[in-house]
Amino acid sequence: MYMSTDEIRRAFLAFFESKGHQIVESSSLVPANDPTLLFTNAGMNQFKDTFLGIEKRSYTRATTAQRCVRAGGKHNDLENVGFTARHHTFFEMLGNFSFGDYFKQDAIKYAWEFLTDVLGLPQDRLLVTIYETDDEAFDIWNKEMGIPADRIVRIGDNKGAPYASDNFWQMGDTGPCGPCSEIFYDHGEHIWGGRPGTPEEDGDRFIEIWNNVFMQFNRQADGTMEPLPKPSVDTGMGIERIAAIMQGVHSNYEIDIFQTLIKKSAEVIGYEDLSNQSLRVVADHIRSCAFLIVDGVMPSNEGRGYVLRRIIRRAVRHGNKLGASGAFFYKLVGPLAEIMGTAGDELKKRQALVEKILKIEEDNFGRTLDRGLTILNDALDNLSGKELDGETVFKLYDTYGFPADLTNDVARERDFTIDEEGFNNAMEAQRQRAREAGKFGVDYNESIKVDVNTEFCGYTGTAAQSSIVALYRDGEAVDSILAGEDALIILDNTPFYAESGGQCGDAGVLTAENTVFNVSDTQKFGAAIGHQGSLVQGALNVGDKLEAQVDVVRRTAITLNHSATHLLHSALRNLLGEHVAQKGSLVKPDALRFDFSNLEAVKPEQLREIERVVNEQIRLNHSIDTNIMDIESAKQKGAMALFGEKYDDEVRVLSMGEFSTELCGGIHAKNTGDIGLFKITSEGGIAAGIRRIEAVTGAAAIDALHAQEALLSETASIVKSDAASVATKVSALLAHSKQLEKDIQQLQDKLAAQESAGLLDQAKEINGVKVLITQLDGADNKALRGMLDEIKNKLGSGIVVLGNVSGDKVGLIVGVTKDLTGKVKAGELVNMVAQQVGGKGGGRPDMAQAGGTDAAALPAALESVTPWLTEKL
């Protein structure tokens, strides 16, 4: 039974919805609040905190069709993409999950039912693996599902340590783990390969299609396995693999999605042979590149942005290899959005932005691609061995933008390898970090864990009666603290807002009888809220009751700035376009910062219009309303979600009239009029395609305007003008200054010509060559260059060495007429002199310049020229 990829996706989600599972949308390819991951690479990523017990959800069963990327960091399939049947940078993982609900029996039953009943796969084509000692799973497969024992393969510890097995899954060195059961499809005897667990298992006959992970243990630091009180299930099935089976093909690249993209790639490149592997590379890479951009990643030279840039450039190089002329890659975005079906809805909304970013990146790389490939191929032609040195690989990266894996691709096609260690050493030596997967690593166990759910009551007030449920000093739990000690206090309820969504944490004071604790910051620790600060007087113990009082003045300033960011966000989208998406923010008492996606700098006139629109909304004094609703209703209302944030099923929707509607858990003003005034203080770029606006509100905005007025008044006074005419007066002064500089230069040129005529008499001959060596103090470098050209022209043939001292700086310039550059190079001569005055320089064979810092050494350095030239001439 043939099924399209989109039909399989729909059938899978509908099947598990019928089994009581909540359909959860694919999360962003940029993991939310998880620094341990470069990209989302599995369906369980968005549920990680739920499996760890840190986060609770309103459902215990879930199903997803998760977009994933594996390129960079630990999970890097990039170099194999296009050269094997099943490696991809982008793939979709179908999954069903149980959070302490059903376990092995139902997980296995559901998988079997979907594969055999819904998809209609023949049972004799399916084979399963289990962990060697998992008799429970064996009995379920054998006795309940009816799988013959000879089609159930036990896999033991095949990775050199206890529980180190292909069929035992673990999140890390410690934490949730358990056995897994994989389902394989047998493509038939006509394809080479052996069953799992045999030496031939890497063949293509038996292909894993579904993995069921049974999380039933909590691994301790000493290696012991403690049973989890509520075992869970995590499963994953690659949609491309099951689509190949349902469409009667063997390679993933033969399924409907890839065939469409391969044909479109050939069309835009102008290439006819659809079997070429480079077309596979292009077809795969457009998927990862397009969806990474949709999820907020922009091409750059670090982190996630650099991985995206590497993938784009690899695709462009393969298109170039097939004869592509001009930009072609961006033309595949439209076909991709159509063939992805329901999974392409978000891409359709942002198609124009994705196309624009890809075209700019492709055009930029195209300027250096041909030159870089020429250098690379020349280097390979001249190799005596089979390995390209790391310095050349680094030069291609540094000068021509060739990622090392792109260079490796070209080398591999010609049966060469690259010196990766040498490349990495060159990168380290120049302190350049192209790939830093390590910086995304963090140990969950290192953070403070508190099994407490602090009730937040700060939406309706700034004071509350609370009790201490935990105390931490230097990261360690303690029972009490004394005056003078810094600590973290966890309360049962609090009006203090913990830093989240860009809004900084509250400050204030916790008090009891004869006891004062100053709170400097408030942070989240799981579901607990921690108050960081110091005990000024008294002592505090776990269980003590106290009064929590937020700094109201500071809180009010923060709320004004936070509400202003919402107005700014909407103004940017209205004026610049819907491609604008928030990439980060910081809301402090004294200012706000807002980062957003935009390919170009915001023009001054656009900034003025943004300010005008925001201030207009402030004057309209909209009521700022909050409503709690389910996430789907919020989206239907048009509420904007913030980049990098995770949301519960029920969300807080904040509205400012019809102008702004966003999901937000922060604290805001009551009315937009409370903001008073909004003033932008700066705009600039912080990364490729990411801009930053900084602004102030209220009293701080008035202060900023006063500061500008004072500066304008001071400038007017300096130029002897009134404020209204200062621009005209400054323009006139600059024009006058420019004319004076021109007049001075003309005079200097005349003086140089006159002086150079007199200097010709000082020229001497060394072995038949005219040589002029002299020091001219007071002349600047520009004057020296003019004199050099004048003297060289009058000499006809000869060598000129001029030096000057200006303050404590030495200037040197050397000229060699072209008939003598075969004997004397200007750069070599100027460096010989420069080294003696504490400097260095360079230039062409006929003209070179240098600088130095040892003015006293200049006379002796110039005297050394004569013997040096005597040897050369």
From Swiss-Prot:
What GO molecular functions are on record for this protein?
A: alanine-tRNA ligase activity; aminoacyl-tRNA deacylase activity; ATP binding; tRNA binding; zinc ion binding
Q: Which GO biological process annotations does it have?
A: alanyl-tRNA aminoacylation; negative regulation of DNA-templated transcription
Could you say which cofactors this protein requires? Zn(2+)
Looking at the keywords, is Cell inner membrane present?
A: no
The record's cofactor note says:
Binds 1 zinc ion per subunit.
Cell compartment(s), UniProt:
Cytoplasm
* Keywords tagged on the record: Aminoacyl-tRNA synthetase, ATP-binding, Cytoplasm, Ligase, Metal-binding, Nucleotide-binding, Protein biosynthesis, RNA-binding, tRNA-binding, Zinc
Instruction: Please provide one cellular component term from the Gene Ontology annotations of this protein.
Output: cytosol
Summarize where Zn(2+) binds, as residue positions: 562, 566, 664, 668
Q: Which domain of life is it from?
A: Bacteria
What protein family does this chain belong to?
Belongs to the class-II aminoacyl-tRNA synthetase family.
Domain comment text? Consists of three domains; the N-terminal catalytic domain, the editing domain and the C-terminal C-Ala domain. The editing domain removes incorrectly charged amino acids, while the C-Ala domain, along with tRNA(Ala), serves as a bridge to cooperatively bring together the editing and aminoacylation centers thus stimulating deacylation of misacylated tRNAs.
Briefly, what is this protein's role?
A: Catalyzes the attachment of alanine to tRNA(Ala) in a two-step reaction: alanine is first activated by ATP to form Ala-AMP and then transferred to the acceptor end of tRNA(Ala). Also edits incorrectly charged Ser-tRNA(Ala) and Gly-tRNA(Ala) via its editing domain.
Protein name as catalogued: Alanine--tRNA ligase
Q: Which organism is it from?
A: Photobacterium profundum (strain SS9)
List the taxonomic lineage: Bacteria, Pseudomonadati, Pseudomonadota, Gammaproteobacteria, Vibrionales
